[in-house]
Regions:
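Domain-level signal for soluble alpha/beta catalytic cores
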Residues: 1-397
């Protein structure tokens, strides 16, 4: 059989879309004109995915606004405009500390206190290092000051309608489309001045996000739950916790997500695990084997995860010892967002076969490690997707 292909969601924004996002934020572009331009852009990005040969496609997350070509956080910050109960202040987001843990339990440190960033502080502070992220401009960052509510219906319906319109234009069924949405655990990593503790925030986020997930799946599209907090969150705890305590912390987030997904067909859900999108050493990442069973507890039949970058490419072997639950399938990353080197199609094919030879061709969908938009130069990102499609064809022979 032919092994199917997809990607994790975020694709490079065009200069026209970035400028339109800026104009809309400044109030010089009205909603009707913006929606028309956005639809044209979504039609174009879906068409390009189809022309490359990708099977399961999306809107490039074009509805998750970016006003700069380089943006590692649009997958998260898009949610700020879809939650009621937030107040905003211009701050350096890396210094914000998420909600405190319940009864002295684990909680996240600030982004700036990440163990990876602390260990390699000289590199992160050096503009010539290639991983410099310091001195970013302040952004309007949210604090929870009231009961969280969902105010994103119009925005998510635009995402849904745009994706379905573009799928129809290229002759693809709705079942070949997906829309990305944030997990409760990731959405909860904002400042809190209302709820009792971090767990209360996570459960409140789950109640809010249920509406977004349900609208996407009710439309026949697959929802991809972006949950880097499950893996990447380990590094944001300083000092390093025990694996046992971290698993208990993460289990709360899994349970809250399953609450949000209650009643939704798992066939229409895929769960994305990653160790963060920043281009750094990642020596403090948690091993996939320590959390993979938690990821498999999610009521999602698809599991997407990093498997191509240099820190995690070796972990494909864990699947030799895991019995994949009935109905579930793997969506491994076989090209990476962490390097500008475009993977050779034969290497891509080898990586695909590593998984397919263990679980079967029909239970593998080849993908990217993470989103490419805002992280990889556009022409390189598209070349990586071409290599992905070519590699899948080779692996299917």
């Amino acid at each position: 059989m032919t092994i199917r292909t997809t990607h994790v969601g975020s694709l490079p924004r065009t200069p026209e879309l970035i400028e339109a996002n800026r104009a809309r934020r400044e109030g010089s572009l009205g909603d009707a004109d913006f929606t028309s331009l956005l639809q044209d852009q979504v039609d174009g990005v879906v068409k390009r995915q189809a022309e490359i040969g990708l099977d399961i496609v999306n809107d490039g997350e074009y509805g998750h606004a970016m006003i700069d070509a380089v943006d590692y956080g649009a997958w998260w910050t898009y949610s700020f405009s879809r939650f009621g109960g937030l107040s905003f202040e211009d701050v350096q987001r890396f210094d914000v500390r998420p909600p405190a843990g319940r009864d002295g339990r684990l909680s996240f440190s600030s982004f700036a206190e990440r163990r990876d960033w602390q260990r390699f502080a000289d590199a992160y502070a050096d503009p010539d290092s290639g991983i410099h992220i310091a001195n970013r401009n302040p952004i309007a960052f949210p604090t929870i000051t009231g009961e969280l509510t969902y105010i994103g219906a119009e925005a998510v319906e635009r995402d849904i309608a745009g994706t379905k319109h573009a799928l129809e234009a290229v002759g693809k069924p709705v079942s070949d489309g997906f829309v990305a949405a944030i997990s409760p655990g990731s959405a909860a990593r904002v400042a809190n001045a209302f709820y009792e503790d971090d767990e209360a925030v996570v459960w409140a986020c789950a109640d809010v996000l249920r509406e977004e997930y349900k609208r996407i799946t009710d439309a026949g599209l697959t929802v991809q739950i972006d949950a880097p907090d499950i893996a990447e969150g380990w590094d944001q705890m300083n000092p390093e916790p025990s694996v046992e305590d971290y698993r208990a912390f993460s289990r709360v987030r899994i349970d809250a997500l399953n609450h949000a997904l209650e009643g939704i067909d798992p066939d229409l859900v895929r769960f994305h695990v990653c160790w963060g999108s920043w281009h750094g050493p990642h020596t403090t990442d948690i091993a996939f084997k320590d959390i993979v069973d938690l990821a498999l507890l999610v009521n999602a039949n698809g599991l997407t995860f990093e498997a191509a970058n240099a820190r995690h490419a070796h972990e494909w072997t864990i699947w030799r010892d895991i019995e994949l639950p009935e109905g579930k399938y793997l969506i491994p990353g076989v090209v990476s967002h962490s390097t500008n080197v475009v993977e050779h199609p034969e290497l891509v094919a080898q990586r695909i076969r590593q998984f397919a030879d263990i679980v079967g061709d029909e239970r593998v969908v080849a993908s990217t490690d993470c989103g490419l938009g805002g992280r990889i130069y556009p022409s390189i990102a598209w070349a990586k997707l071409e290599a992905l499609a070519q590699g899948a064809r080779l692996a299917s022979k």
